[in-house]
């Protein structure tokens, strides 16, 4: 098949500073090429000159010094051209399916305290079944609303002393049930407990992005829930709460309606909070209005995604990248997947790995059963370990996928490690098990209103639209036998159908004490200390206070509670510190932290 080189080259214009009000242009020169293999046959893929392929797609990237961090980028005047027919055929053979528009990520970032204009482009797009490529665009800079982008809660909800807080954990996306026994196991007294006083908080946003300007929820958000049996004002034995919990690992949609999992490198669990108190208004899941208009699109399948990944080996003994199975003594290994009710549409596999192959001739091959579906030469640039990605498809899918990965090596010193296997497929909308998450991202340009058809449902089944992760909405169903239909606008949305019979159960973590880091005043010195060293950290703080400095001493878990919804994440500590910087810059720049 093809070796996708996983290198990323940035063009950095060190002496060029672009200022507010100026309009600039980017022109993409499509005279570059990169040689790839389909089986044993080489092909030259056209790329942007000076750049190659990133995860199988042509790309362009640029960085420039900029005049101000407090600006945002507007892209205008994008110009495309049709890709030559012979190149379109190569892209099709590679299984490349671009999005409807080029993906342009343009922003102002801070590097070493200096503002940098950064732009990364995946320049291909699909138009009515034909491929086009971006050849130029203009960009300009606009003033950014600092108050909006640097807004922090004045006080954390965890500072509410009118009730009690309890932390719980979830392992995957889905609908979770909290019953009376679970509440009591958490230490909550359910005698005379009014269900209107039970609230669920949590963000479910996965790992905090490394980019400082990324938009994420500040503090922790209240989640809409369902409380069965709350009408009588007491929490009885048969009463229970339903909420939608998001796991630690998130999925994102990439080009060609394919999904990629963004793995949380520090946690396999996501955390939520139960708050019991009368000072907060209850937030309940609302029901959407019935849509009477006729649908123009029928939906009976959805986009299925799965991933296989084991964290067993860290090749550089540091960093976030871990690998799984080793291909050395055992050069041929099988991986089995089950895709119930798979549609007769090619199943796409993306196999990522690392190998220390230093010479040509070593190969990785992929079989589904006995059929060879992908093959490529291992990367051999001479570096210690190099990453590679094999992208292929099985055109005759079945519910049972038996994937065989084999390394054919000429030298016994060549060792390969599997990173992960990503699967993208189409499944029939048939409920298997207690609940099913589903979504559709690819729509016809003529689609406006969709009618979804669900199979194998019962009279207790229901559907939630969870596109707003904190405020799910219940969608009315029309039931007929074991079939159900509902209507929704033809646009990307995350949905879940549940049998109404059984649900996932969260894991108890424990109660937490009141805290309010958001309410801390500005300080000269910030100390983050593990509990084991907290006494000594406070001694150090007292020493600096005696010298006239204002000091805060904080434990990491307290920061995680307010800045990463309870998950261990170094990005939360960065955001905690950044809160003091941002508040000072808006009010008194001289008051920003110094240590």
Where are these regions (language model features)?
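Bacterial Sec-dependent N-terminal signal peptides
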Residues: 1-25
